Protein backbone atom coordinates (compact mmCIF):
# COMPACT_ATOMS: atom_id res chain seq x y z
CA UNK A 1 0.00 0.00 0.00
CA UNK A 2 1.29 3.47 -0.89
CA UNK A 3 1.99 5.28 2.39
CA UNK A 4 2.15 8.83 1.02
CA UNK A 5 -0.10 10.09 3.85
CA UNK A 6 2.12 8.49 6.50
CA UNK A 7 -0.54 6.64 8.49
CA UNK A 8 0.34 3.02 7.77
CA UNK A 9 0.69 1.11 11.07
CA UNK A 10 0.49 4.37 13.03
CA UNK A 11 -1.75 4.74 16.11
CA UNK A 12 -4.46 7.38 15.74
CA UNK A 13 -7.24 8.49 18.09
CA UNK A 14 -10.64 9.63 16.81
CA UNK A 15 -13.35 11.07 19.07
CA UNK A 16 -16.96 11.16 17.97
CA UNK A 17 -16.04 8.09 15.94
CA UNK A 18 -19.48 6.49 15.78
CA UNK A 19 -21.06 8.90 13.32
CA UNK A 20 -20.66 11.92 11.07
CA UNK A 21 -17.23 13.41 10.54
CA UNK A 22 -15.63 11.09 13.07
CA UNK A 23 -16.97 8.06 11.25
CA UNK A 24 -15.73 9.59 7.99
CA UNK A 25 -12.24 9.84 9.48
CA UNK A 26 -12.38 6.27 10.73
CA UNK A 27 -13.42 4.88 7.36
CA UNK A 28 -10.59 6.60 5.50
CA UNK A 29 -7.97 5.86 8.16
CA UNK A 30 -8.81 2.16 8.07
CA UNK A 31 -8.51 2.15 4.28
CA UNK A 32 -4.98 3.55 4.47
CA UNK A 33 -3.69 1.22 7.15
CA UNK A 34 -3.84 3.18 10.41
CA UNK A 35 -4.39 1.58 13.79
CA UNK A 36 -7.60 3.35 14.80
CA UNK A 37 -8.58 3.85 18.43
CA UNK A 38 -12.19 5.01 18.30
CA UNK A 39 -13.74 6.96 21.19
CA UNK A 40 -17.45 7.68 21.50
CA UNK A 41 -20.27 7.51 24.01
CA UNK A 42 -22.16 5.50 21.38
CA UNK A 43 -21.26 2.15 19.87
CA UNK A 44 -18.64 2.19 17.11
CA UNK A 45 -19.38 -0.53 14.57
CA UNK A 46 -16.38 -0.05 12.26
CA UNK A 47 -13.63 -2.71 12.49
CA UNK A 48 -11.22 -0.49 14.43
CA UNK A 49 -8.19 -1.58 16.44
CA UNK A 50 -10.03 -0.70 19.62
CA UNK A 51 -13.37 0.93 20.43
CA UNK A 52 -13.54 2.72 23.77
CA UNK A 53 -16.69 4.10 25.37
CA UNK A 54 -16.13 7.57 26.81
CA UNK A 55 -18.25 10.38 28.20
CA UNK A 56 -16.14 13.32 27.14
CA UNK A 57 -17.77 15.71 29.61
CA UNK A 58 -16.62 13.52 32.51
CA UNK A 59 -12.97 13.78 33.58
CA UNK A 60 -12.83 10.30 35.12
CA UNK A 61 -14.27 8.78 31.96
CA UNK A 62 -11.64 10.58 29.88
CA UNK A 63 -8.86 9.33 32.16
CA UNK A 64 -10.17 5.78 31.93
CA UNK A 65 -10.24 6.00 28.13
CA UNK A 66 -6.70 7.39 28.00
CA UNK A 67 -5.53 4.46 30.12
CA UNK A 68 -6.67 2.11 27.34
CA UNK A 69 -4.74 3.93 24.61
CA UNK A 70 -1.24 3.01 23.40
CA UNK A 71 1.93 4.67 24.65
CA UNK A 72 2.70 6.24 21.28
CA UNK A 73 0.16 8.18 19.22
CA UNK A 74 0.70 9.74 15.81
CA UNK A 75 -2.49 11.74 15.29
CA UNK A 76 -5.55 12.90 17.21
CA UNK A 77 -8.85 13.76 15.52
CA UNK A 78 -11.21 15.75 17.77
CA UNK A 79 -14.59 15.21 16.11
CA UNK A 80 -16.94 14.82 19.10
CA UNK A 81 -19.52 17.59 19.25
CA UNK A 82 -23.14 18.41 20.01
CA UNK A 83 -25.55 21.22 19.03
CA UNK A 84 -27.18 23.66 21.43
CA UNK A 85 -30.13 23.43 21.52
CA UNK A 86 -31.31 20.70 22.06
CA UNK A 87 -28.28 19.94 24.26
CA UNK A 88 -28.10 22.31 27.27
CA UNK A 89 -25.53 25.11 27.12
CA UNK A 90 -23.36 23.79 29.96
CA UNK A 91 -23.17 20.29 28.47
CA UNK A 92 -22.39 21.72 25.05
CA UNK A 93 -19.34 23.67 26.20
CA UNK A 94 -18.14 20.77 28.35
CA UNK A 95 -18.36 18.30 25.44
CA UNK A 96 -17.29 20.53 22.57
CA UNK A 97 -14.39 22.24 24.30
CA UNK A 98 -13.55 21.36 27.91
CA UNK A 99 -13.55 17.60 27.37
CA UNK A 100 -11.74 18.01 24.05
CA UNK A 101 -9.01 20.06 25.73
CA UNK A 102 -8.69 17.59 28.61
CA UNK A 103 -8.32 14.59 26.32
CA UNK A 104 -5.88 16.38 24.02
CA UNK A 105 -3.66 17.50 26.88
CA UNK A 106 -3.66 14.06 28.49
CA UNK A 107 -2.39 12.64 25.18
CA UNK A 108 0.39 15.15 24.51
CA UNK A 109 3.05 13.20 26.39
CA UNK A 110 2.31 10.16 24.21
CA UNK A 111 2.47 11.93 20.87
CA UNK A 112 5.29 11.06 18.53
CA UNK A 113 7.67 13.62 17.06
CA UNK A 114 5.93 15.21 14.06
CA UNK A 115 2.56 14.12 15.42
CA UNK A 116 -0.61 16.06 14.62
CA UNK A 117 -3.90 17.21 16.10
CA UNK A 118 -6.93 18.29 14.08
CA UNK A 119 -10.18 19.52 15.61
CA UNK A 120 -13.62 20.28 14.19
CA UNK A 121 -14.82 23.81 14.92
CA UNK A 122 -17.51 25.49 12.79
CA UNK A 123 -18.25 28.54 10.72
CA UNK A 124 -20.41 29.41 13.75
CA UNK A 125 -17.18 29.81 15.72
CA UNK A 126 -15.49 32.15 13.28
CA UNK A 127 -16.67 35.24 15.14
CA UNK A 128 -13.92 34.46 17.65
CA UNK A 129 -12.11 37.74 17.07
CA UNK A 130 -15.06 39.91 18.15
CA UNK A 131 -15.56 37.78 21.29
CA UNK A 132 -11.89 37.40 22.20
CA UNK A 133 -12.14 39.05 25.63
CA UNK A 134 -14.80 36.59 26.82
CA UNK A 135 -13.09 33.61 25.23
CA UNK A 136 -9.76 34.44 26.87
CA UNK A 137 -11.50 34.95 30.21
CA UNK A 138 -12.81 31.40 29.99
CA UNK A 139 -9.57 29.93 28.67
CA UNK A 140 -7.76 31.33 31.72
CA UNK A 141 -9.55 28.51 33.56
CA UNK A 142 -6.99 26.07 32.24
CA UNK A 143 -7.98 22.96 34.18
CA UNK A 144 -11.03 20.75 33.73
CA UNK A 145 -12.21 21.56 37.26
CA UNK A 146 -11.82 25.33 37.01
CA UNK A 147 -13.53 25.45 33.62
CA UNK A 148 -16.38 23.35 34.97
CA UNK A 149 -16.75 25.65 37.96
CA UNK A 150 -16.64 28.83 35.83
CA UNK A 151 -19.43 27.62 33.56
CA UNK A 152 -21.63 27.17 36.63
CA UNK A 153 -21.17 30.77 37.78
CA UNK A 154 -23.64 33.47 36.83
CA UNK A 155 -21.00 35.19 34.70
CA UNK A 156 -19.96 31.97 33.01
CA UNK A 157 -23.52 30.98 32.21
CA UNK A 158 -24.20 34.41 30.71
CA UNK A 159 -21.04 34.60 28.60
CA UNK A 160 -21.48 31.06 27.28
CA UNK A 161 -25.22 31.30 26.62
CA UNK A 162 -24.63 31.02 22.86
CA UNK A 163 -22.94 27.77 23.77
CA UNK A 164 -22.33 26.16 20.40
CA UNK A 165 -20.65 29.21 18.87
CA UNK A 166 -18.79 29.96 22.11
CA UNK A 167 -17.42 26.43 22.39
CA UNK A 168 -16.12 26.57 18.83
CA UNK A 169 -14.59 30.02 19.37
CA UNK A 170 -12.77 28.58 22.38
CA UNK A 171 -11.48 25.70 20.28
CA UNK A 172 -10.13 28.09 17.66
CA UNK A 173 -8.41 30.45 20.10
CA UNK A 174 -7.03 27.50 22.08
CA UNK A 175 -5.37 26.32 18.88
CA UNK A 176 -3.82 29.73 18.22
CA UNK A 177 -2.61 30.02 21.82
CA UNK A 178 -0.93 26.61 21.82
CA UNK A 179 0.64 26.45 18.36
CA UNK A 180 4.04 27.74 19.48
CA UNK A 181 4.48 25.49 22.49
CA UNK A 182 3.40 22.46 20.47
CA UNK A 183 5.83 23.41 17.70
CA UNK A 184 8.63 23.21 20.26
CA UNK A 185 7.51 19.62 20.85
CA UNK A 186 7.32 19.00 17.08
CA UNK A 187 3.53 18.55 17.22
CA UNK A 188 1.19 20.26 14.75
CA UNK A 189 -2.30 21.53 15.59
CA UNK A 190 -4.97 22.75 13.16
CA UNK A 191 -8.71 23.38 13.19
CA UNK A 192 -11.28 23.08 10.43
CA UNK A 193 -14.49 25.07 10.10
CA UNK A 194 -17.00 23.05 8.07
CA UNK A 195 -19.90 24.48 6.14
CA UNK A 196 -23.31 22.81 6.71
CA UNK A 197 -22.88 19.05 6.71
CA UNK A 198 -25.58 16.40 6.51
CA UNK A 199 -25.25 14.21 9.59
CA UNK A 200 -26.99 13.11 12.79
CA UNK A 201 -25.97 16.55 14.08
CA UNK A 202 -27.88 18.32 11.30
CA UNK A 203 -30.88 16.08 11.91
CA UNK A 204 -30.91 17.23 15.54
CA UNK A 205 -30.88 20.82 14.33
CA UNK A 206 -33.85 20.18 12.06
CA UNK A 207 -35.78 18.68 14.96
CA UNK A 208 -35.58 22.01 16.82
CA UNK A 209 -36.64 24.04 13.81
CA UNK A 210 -33.26 24.91 12.30
CA UNK A 211 -33.83 23.15 9.01
CA UNK A 212 -32.43 23.77 5.56
CA UNK A 213 -34.39 26.99 5.22
CA UNK A 214 -31.92 28.34 7.79
CA UNK A 215 -28.74 26.43 6.98
CA UNK A 216 -29.10 27.12 3.24
CA UNK A 217 -27.98 30.68 4.07
CA UNK A 218 -24.55 29.30 5.02
CA UNK A 219 -23.91 26.95 2.12
CA UNK A 220 -21.50 27.81 -0.71
CA UNK A 221 -22.80 29.16 -3.99
CA UNK A 222 -23.13 25.70 -5.49
CA UNK A 223 -25.80 24.98 -2.86
CA UNK A 224 -24.08 21.77 -1.89
CA UNK A 225 -24.13 20.26 1.59
CA UNK A 226 -21.09 18.31 2.72
CA UNK A 227 -21.24 14.86 4.26
CA UNK A 228 -19.21 13.24 7.01
CA UNK A 229 -16.83 11.71 4.50
CA UNK A 230 -16.04 15.09 2.94
CA UNK A 231 -14.95 16.47 6.30
CA UNK A 232 -13.30 13.23 7.36
CA UNK A 233 -11.11 13.28 4.27
CA UNK A 234 -10.13 16.89 4.92
CA UNK A 235 -9.13 16.04 8.49
CA UNK A 236 -7.13 13.00 7.39
CA UNK A 237 -5.30 15.10 4.81
CA UNK A 238 -4.53 17.91 7.26
CA UNK A 239 -3.15 15.53 9.90
CA UNK A 240 -1.11 13.62 7.32
CA UNK A 241 2.60 13.86 6.60
CA UNK A 242 1.81 15.74 3.37
CA UNK A 243 0.83 18.71 5.56
CA UNK A 244 3.94 18.37 7.73
CA UNK A 245 4.70 22.12 7.73
CA UNK A 246 1.12 23.28 8.30
CA UNK A 247 0.23 24.24 11.87
CA UNK A 248 -1.81 26.85 13.70
CA UNK A 249 -4.22 27.18 10.79
CA UNK A 250 -7.93 27.87 10.90
CA UNK A 251 -9.06 26.13 7.73
CA UNK A 252 -12.54 26.73 6.29
CA UNK A 253 -13.73 23.55 4.58
CA UNK A 254 -16.72 25.12 2.90
CA UNK A 255 -16.21 25.16 -0.88
CA UNK A 256 -15.55 28.90 -0.78
CA UNK A 257 -18.32 30.19 1.51
CA UNK A 258 -15.81 32.06 3.67
CA UNK A 259 -14.07 33.39 0.55
CA UNK A 260 -17.39 34.74 -0.70
CA UNK A 261 -17.83 36.63 2.56
CA UNK A 262 -14.26 37.92 2.52
CA UNK A 263 -14.81 39.20 -1.02
CA UNK A 264 -18.00 40.98 0.03
CA UNK A 265 -20.15 38.76 -2.17
CA UNK A 266 -22.28 37.43 0.71
CA UNK A 267 -23.69 39.00 3.86
CA UNK A 268 -21.50 38.21 6.86
CA UNK A 269 -24.33 36.85 8.97
CA UNK A 270 -21.99 35.12 11.44
CA UNK A 271 -19.47 37.97 11.81
CA UNK A 272 -16.80 35.70 10.36
CA UNK A 273 -13.14 36.64 10.51
CA UNK A 274 -10.05 34.63 9.62
Which role fits each region the language model picked out?
Residues 193-204:
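Short, flexible catalytic-loop segment of classical short-chain dehydrogenase/reductase
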Residues 82-86, 113-184, 196-197:
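Catalytic loop of short-chain dehydrogenase/reductase
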Residues 2-37:
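Canonical Rossmann dinucleotide-binding motif of NAD(H)/NADP(H)-dependent dehydrogenases/reductases
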Residues 102, 191, 210-246, 251-255, ...:
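C-terminal helical subdomain
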Residues 2, 247-274:
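Short C-terminal tail/terminal secondary-structure segment
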Residues 15-16, 73-81, 114-122, 190-194:
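Rossmann-fold scaffold of SDR-type NAD(P)-dependent oxidoreductases
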Residues 46-62:
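Rossmann-fold cofactor-recognition segment
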